[in-house]
Amino acid sequence: MRENYETLVSVGTAELLPLSAFLSPSEPGRAVGGGSHADEGQEPAGCGDPQGGQPRHSLHLTALVQLVKEIPEFLFGEVKGAMDSPESESRGASLDGERASPEAAAAREPCPLRGLLSCLPDGPTSQPHLATTPTDSSCSSGPTGDGVQGSPLPIKTADKPWPTRKEGPGALGGEPSPPTHSPSRRKSHRGQERGTSEAGISPGNSPLQGLINCLKEILVPGPRHPETSPSFLPPLPSLGTSRLTRADLGPGSPPWAVKTEAVSGDCPLQGLLHCLKELPEAQDRHPSPSGVGNRRLQENPGAWKRGSGGPGYLLTPPPHPDLGAGGLLSVKMENSWVQSPPGPASCQPGRQPLSPSATGDTRGVPQPSWGPEAQAASASSSPLEALEACLKGIPPNGSSPSQLPPTSCSQNPQPGDSRSQKPELQPHRSHSEEATREPVLPLGLQSCVRDGPSRPLAPRGTPTSFSSSSSTDWDLDFGSPVGNQGQHPGKGSPPGSSPLQGLENCLKEIPVPVLRPAWPCSSAADRGPRRAEPRNWTADKEGLRAEACESARLGQGRGEAPTRSLHLVSPQVFTSSCVPACHQRGFKDPGATRPGVWRWLPEGSAPKPSPLHCLESALRGILPVRPLRFACVGGPSPSPSPGSSSSFSGSEGEDPRPEPDLWKPLPQERDRLPSCKPPVPLSPCPGGTPAGSSGGSPGEDPRRTEPRYCSGLGAGTAQDPCPVSQLEKRPRVSEASRGLELGHGRPRVAAKTHERLLPQGPPELPSESPPPELPPPEAAPPVLPASSLQPPCHCGKPLQQELHSLGAALAEKLDRLATALAGLAQEVATMRTQVNRLGRRPQGPGPMGQASWMWTLPRGPRWAHGPGHRHLPYWRQKGPTRPKPKILRGQGESCRAGDLQGLSRGTARRARPLPPDAPPAEPPGLHCSSSQQLLSSTPSCHAAPPAHPLLAHTGGHQSPLPPLVPAALPLQGASPPAASADADVPTSGVAPDGIPERPKEPSSLLGGVQRALQEELWGGEHRDPRWGAH
């Protein structure tokens, strides 16, 4: 202790305080740190104590905090004076570690990092030094109220962010209990630590390591540390939200991991540290981090006490369990968020702690901090400057493309890199807010976010946590840039912030939809689009809706998206607060018309669409449910709606559904345009047609998505029919009411819509281009069956029904065909028997019979030679079917190749008369008819198979045979009409023969075939005279 104390004194003060001074303050918290600044030595003991008794660890932390707080007094008679500069440093360093980070970082850096590394494995974090850092950050956040966290980390970053940070984390870890304590205590602690860090540049390593170990041990008891650390963790998330979130997602002590992640990314951590460091500076208005840190400590401590230390502290632990490792950051964020919803004052202070990462930055204090922080960021990294420049460009634009693009970028990366981008986004948004306030802040944030986020890109929790804090903070912060509402939670979502928020929300939605429910709603109303997006998050815990919402929102340009997001979050809240805001905005954006939304989209539209699509793709990959919905054009809308919020699903689903419509048929666009109120603005833009507020940009987004859905649907079902039905349905849904789709979305409307769509969808199909498609489906049942597979999709229901009806009709026709075939087979058998009889009978009749046979025979030469005799015996022996069947076969083939329609027409006419002929009469004329029958019977047999399809087409027995006969007729050279005329003539001329034939034929098919054969064989003119003669 003495050694540590001396080190602290040497580093922090010229004057050495008696060890007793340390002991006396440390005695109360002796268990925690013995000599707070021997506390490196003792803090490990204290840590042991916390480890020994998790419940007591908070007490140990408190004692340590007290000791730290009093240490500056002992070490520095000017607890606050020294604290302001040293304390800011100590804030920056959080405790020893944080202070040491700037001063002792050089010498300590390696040791503390190593110590942290050694400790980190023990700690919850997988990254040793980072783990410690998270502890420090979390602890510092709690005690320092994120001022420490932000300040210490930034200070560390400025000096030696990595090692110092790690040391700082240790100090913070020791301090976690202090979070509850007043900022002065933290300041004292920091002052001491600063002295310690300074004094312990070389010796400080061991003290810092000890402190880190103590903090690590304190944190190691995850349950305990989360209690103290959770409050810290909320600030931590702000510092290294993305990192923390990632770490949080992974390990039980995600904050450490997160912090570890941040620390592990030295450059990112450094940027974050600088940002946080300068945030305190901004608070204190001290050019040096210490000054800032001090002010921040003073301000944030209270705020953190209120927001983070008190509610945040308590809230954080529960969110921590909820979020788990990954959720820790979110929890932290939520702590600040919770704080922010509870009270803007506490929220702002809480945010300040958060602002180091994103929220605090935007806040009033963080904004000033950001100014120096921005400087630090600039100094820390050029990329941060670039980000800052982007952010600066964004705030002016409000939702300008510059802002949106960063958001888009962050959104796209969010799944992986998006984290870093997302933190950037938050910084961007913070910057947007600060752009009005102080563009520099974003740089610091960017340094933290960009550098840090890149490290934490892996964990998604970070974006979520970041998003959570960012969302709330952004809502508050971005509100401020747009309307200075950002500082107050929900004061308005600036146009510029909303796009960023939408992107952030999209990213957030991807990682963590759970934490957003409470504050996103409140912020949604306040923030409008931004909150709405967090709300989407919460509502879309699945992340599917949130994602869709976000995508739609992004596509919409945040005016519309917020509406959806709000709908998603809670239709009521959204409708009451956000819907008006969103609609106002949406109407603002699309209000002018779609152009308004499109303007926003144009601002960030170009970047948005691709990021949204990327997010969509990522979400689809991530979220199987949504992909399924997307897979089905109709399915996607219904899926989302039941999932989290009908309104969101509806609004987004509506867009997706109509989108394909827009994509595929413009008519549906029209439908959607009329159906949607925003459609007026949307009408200018087919993509936007769905709705000015919700359909517009989501239209684009969903469109892009929808085309896929359409493709899936089209592929699954007949693309034309399915898409048409979908399109029609979608327009109907939108027409029925955007409210249905937006408010009720697919959940309620899914059935209703389908019910309506089933009746309406089919009508639309006929009404629009679909009607032709519908008949073709009948003609081409295979397509319909394909689409029938997709009926699961709600949009496919109407198609499904149609397909079912078509299938039933087809089945009936097939049955008829089967029956006709059976009848034809019977008729063929009858024909054969009749032919045999006729073959015998022609002999009986004599020359007339022979003549008739000759006439019947198709080949005149045979007749001339008197092949009648031959034929008679031939017929008797073999039956005329074979020879004539050959001809008939050729004819049948020709029939198959011939015009089925024309044949069917001609044959249908003949066949119709034939059906009446039931009994096969055998008059003398029958001989001819019998031969013809034989011929026709054979063709009927041959043609029957082809006729089946024809029958399926025409649906009648007559139709199948008639097509065959007509085909033969065209081959013969007689047109179907001519054939029909010929048939009529023969019928009239040879009433006994022609008519008997028909009566003979029990089935109209046989009669029609016979007629056709007779016409073909006889030839029109020859038949007529001969028929008349006979």
Swiss-Prot record:
It comes from the Eukaryota. Residues 760-784, 913-923 have a biased composition (Pro residues). Residues 27-56, 80-208, 225-255, 281-505, 634-788, 870-1030 are annotated as: Disordered. Residues 870-887 have a biased composition (Basic residues). Keywords: Coiled coil, Phosphoprotein. Residues 124-143, 397-418 have a biased composition (Polar residues). Expressed in brain (cerebellum). It holds the Pfam family KRBA1. InterPro entries: KRBA1, KRBA1_rpt. This is Protein KRBA1.
